[in-house]
């Protein structure tokens, strides 16, 4: 066992040779490297698989042995200061290693096919391998200096991958936005690290925790300054894990390739912030009010992310806001003292969200031959619908991932999410109400995504996609739908006659004539004399295999944390895994879970989720939509003041969600303009005042010199006369003043 731990430092460096080899190959032998490009994908998967096997061995030993191992190399700069570099293996590290390697392998296998036709194939795998190296280095770091170094490398890799298609202006802007937003958090993290070093004199976690605890207990440190340093550390986690108010980069990060979205949202960049909070939780618990601050940010993010996901058209952006909301749950958990629940939900959410993003990539991949390769079309759920007929395997995997995220038993997220929901009642009833209500919103927006994508008919045939202005058959109008006919943009929920009434909550079904059916049946394009049907198609096996593997994780990974000890069989593997970390936090590890209480709370949470699913089916399900066109039902619809008021409320919710809560507008219009105005003021002061004084001295000197120059005519006699005259004047003045 000791032998295994001694070589654990190799794990972060295993994927790195791929990055170096691709870079050197493209520089030295570019033709051969490009011709053999598929072999680099194989080596990427192989090396990360070796890291996964190594990580699994460490995890098994952690579960069985439950102890913490740390090894450090000391680099002495002088007699008073030295830096230590090393690696730390504990339950938190082993959990993150398993997450990063397993999800990373699935994404790499998936990417081999997804990126096969992209000119940046090699560059993509070089970035991905370096991304995995950076994240593995981050989670094995033994001190804050190493954390910060790998933290910056993770940010750099995310910048490169989000802007992978940098020739696209939206992608270039998105990576810049992610970079700048994370700069704010990284600056806070750096200040917090320096502040804590100034207080404790150490970067090592164990020393830092013990010293700071003793200083606070003995009142030997200013508590406000310690709280400020801890808050600055948390700001770094807020930015990296897309928590309010530094969440604005996450939806725009969808401009990168879909495999990158899966990796960022499941096991790498957004998990880095959660990891930092979990690693520093012993520090946060001894500083007053920091835990309250963490829980407050978490609950705000939970609700904000869910509301912003309600009206998005882009399938990846909807999943991005879903990630933001779920990360809010994970951030809320340690804030209320539920360390185990936070890591449990981090695990279950990682696999479920990776499955959903890879499923969305399969959907986009199937839509691109029909609508083109523009993300505004291939990712637009309004042009989808009815895909269950064409991509059945993707549909099944996406459905299971959706159920898991909604908290449906016995899928993975049910067990972890319920644990967080139950713990919120012990912390604050207000937080509990928000968290439980958001569980219903989660079910609503996730099934909205599922129904818009897979239910009904393929909407690209009904959206005037051929750029024709007239369409005599089926039309729908839903939240986020751009109807062909002009509508009042200030009244998204129409109050037309019953024959033309549209709802942005539901689909309005109209009768399809024979021409419309023929158009649907034979929607095709002609290449020469050959007609090729333009319908979505299922992805290749290379893309389906990772999704099926992630389905297995989604089905069974939740069982590692079932909190029931039946005497003979202890199903709670996670608690055994986390025993050293729980003891470090001085938490009560002997908490018992009552079966009756758990089932009662589970019934409540599942009922709320079912309510959200039911509402989604009412508003977006094709079966229910067919009843909305009946005159009997329409006759009961009355346009009165209450209906208009409800329409305005719904429109307000829609506008809030679709416009991202106006937070981006606020940052763009207020903060950016304020900073730009301040910069212009400073520029004016520098150019006109500072430079004006300097230039004024030069101008005055110039004119004085020119004046003196004009006096002289170049004759020596004139100079002698002026000299004698000046001396005479000086003598006369001296004579009169001396008396």
Swiss-Prot record:
MF-aspect GO terms: NADH dehydrogenase (ubiquinone) activity; quinone binding
EC class (word): translocase
Record bears the keyword DNA-binding: no
GO CC terms: chloroplast thylakoid membrane
Cell location: Plastid, Chloroplast thylakoid membrane
GO biological process annotation, one example: electron transport coupled proton transport
InterPro entries (UniProt xref): NADH_UbQ_OxRdtase_chlpt_su5_C, NADHpl_OxRdtase_5_subgr, ND/Mrp_TM, NU5C-like, Proton_antipo_N
Family: Belongs to the complex I subunit 5 family.
Role noted for this protein: NDH shuttles electrons from NAD(P)H:plastoquinone, via FMN and iron-sulfur (Fe-S) centers, to quinones in the photosynthetic chain and possibly in a chloroplast respiratory chain. The immediate electron acceptor for the enzyme in this species is believed to be plastoquinone. Couples the redox reaction to proton translocation, and thus conserves the redox energy in a proton gradient.
Name of the protein in its database record: NAD(P)H-quinone oxidoreductase subunit 5, chloroplastic
Native species: Acorus calamus var. americanus
């Amino acid at each position: 066992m000791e032998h295994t731990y001694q070589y654990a430092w190799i794990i972060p460096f295993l994927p790195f040779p791929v990055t170096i080899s691709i870079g050197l190959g493209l520089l030295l032998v570019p033709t051969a490297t490009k011709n053999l490009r598929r072999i680099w994908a194989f080596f990427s998967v192989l090396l990360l698989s070796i890291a996964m096997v190594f990580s699994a061995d460490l995890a098994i030993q952690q579960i069985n042995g439950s102890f913490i191992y740390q090894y450090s190399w000391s680099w002495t700069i002088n007699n008073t200061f030295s830096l230590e570099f090393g690696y730390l293996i504990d339950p938190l590290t082993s959990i993150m290693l398993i997450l990063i390697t397993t999800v990373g392998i699935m994404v790499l296998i998936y990417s081999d096919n997804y990126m096969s036709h992209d000119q940046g194939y090699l560059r993509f795998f070089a970035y991905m391998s370096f991304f995995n190296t950076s994240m593995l280095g981050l989670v094995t770091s033994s001190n804050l200096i190493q954390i910060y170094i790998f933290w910056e490398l993770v940010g750099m890799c995310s910048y490169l991958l989000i802007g992978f298609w940098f020739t696209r202006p939206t992608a270039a802007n998105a990576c810049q936005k992610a970079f700048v937003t994370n700069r704010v958090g990284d600056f806070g993290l750096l200040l917090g690290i320096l502040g804590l070093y100034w207080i404790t004199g150490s970067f090592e976690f164990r020393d830092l925790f013990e010293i700071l605890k003793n200083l606070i207990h003995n009142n030997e440190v200013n508590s406000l300054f310690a709280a400020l340093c801890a808050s600055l550390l948390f700001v770094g986690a807020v930015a990296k894990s897309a928590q309010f108010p530094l969440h604005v980069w996450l939806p725009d990060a969808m401009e990168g390739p879909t495999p990158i979205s899966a990796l960022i949202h499941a096991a790498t960049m957004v998990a880095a912030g959660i990891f930092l909070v979990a690693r520093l939780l012993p520090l946060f618990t001894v500083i007053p009010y920091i835990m309250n601050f963490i829980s407050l940010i978490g609950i705000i993010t939970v609700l904000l992310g869910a509301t912003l996901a309600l009206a998005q058209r882009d399938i990846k952006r909807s999943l991005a806001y879903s990630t933001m909301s779920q990360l809010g749950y994970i951030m809320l958990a340690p804030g209320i003292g539920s360390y185990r629940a936070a890591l449990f939900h981090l695990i279950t959410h990682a696999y479920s969200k990776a499955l959903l993003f890879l499923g969305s990539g399969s959907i986009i991949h199937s839509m691109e031959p029909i609508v083109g390769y523009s993300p505004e079309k291939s990712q637009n759920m309004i042009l989808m619908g009815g895909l269950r007929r064409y991509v059945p395997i993707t549909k099944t995997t996406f459905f299971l991932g959706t159920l898991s995220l909604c908290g449906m038993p016995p899928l993975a997220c049910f067990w972890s999410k319920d644990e967080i929901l139950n713990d919120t009642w012990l912390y604050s009833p207000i937080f509990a109400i928000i968290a439980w209500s958001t569980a219903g919103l989660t079910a609503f927006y996730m099934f909205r995504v599922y129904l818009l994508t897979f239910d009904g008919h393929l909407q690209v045939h009904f959206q005037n996609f051929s750029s024709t202005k007239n369409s005599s058959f089926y039309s729908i109008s839903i939240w986020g739908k751009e109807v062909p006919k002009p509508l009042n943009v200030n009244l998204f929920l129409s109050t037309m006659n019953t024959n033309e009434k549209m709802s942005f909550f539901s689909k309005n079904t109209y009768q399809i004539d024979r021409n419309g059916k023929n158009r649907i049946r034979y929607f095709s394009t002609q290449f020469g004399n050959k007609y090729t049907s333009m319908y979505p198609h299922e992805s290749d096996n290379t893309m389906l295999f990772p999704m099926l593997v992630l389905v297995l994780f989604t089905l069974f990974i939740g069982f590692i944390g079932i909190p029931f000890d039946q005497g003979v069989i202890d199903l709670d593997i996670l608690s055994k895994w986390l025993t050293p970390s729980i003891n470090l936090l001085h938490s009560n590890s002997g908490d018992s879970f009552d079966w009756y209480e758990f089932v009662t709370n589970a019934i409540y949470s599942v009922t709320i989720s079912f309510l959200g699913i039911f509402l989604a089916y009412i508003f977006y399900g094709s079966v229910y939509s067919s009843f909305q066109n009946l005159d009997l039902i329409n006759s009961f619809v009355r346009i009165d003041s209450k209906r208009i008021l409800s329409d305005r409320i719904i429109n307000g919710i829609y506008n809030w969600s679709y416009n991202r809560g106006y937070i981006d507008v606020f940052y763009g219009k207020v903060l950016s303009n304020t900073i730009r105005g301040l910069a212009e003021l400073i520029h004016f002061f520098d150019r006109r005042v500072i430079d004006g004084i300097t230039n004024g001295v030069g101008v005055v000197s110039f004119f004085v010199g020119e004046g003196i120059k004009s006096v002289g005519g170049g004759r020596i006699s004139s100079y002698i006369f002026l000299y004698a005259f000046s001396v005479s004047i000086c003598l006369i003045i001296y004579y009169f003043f001396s008396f």
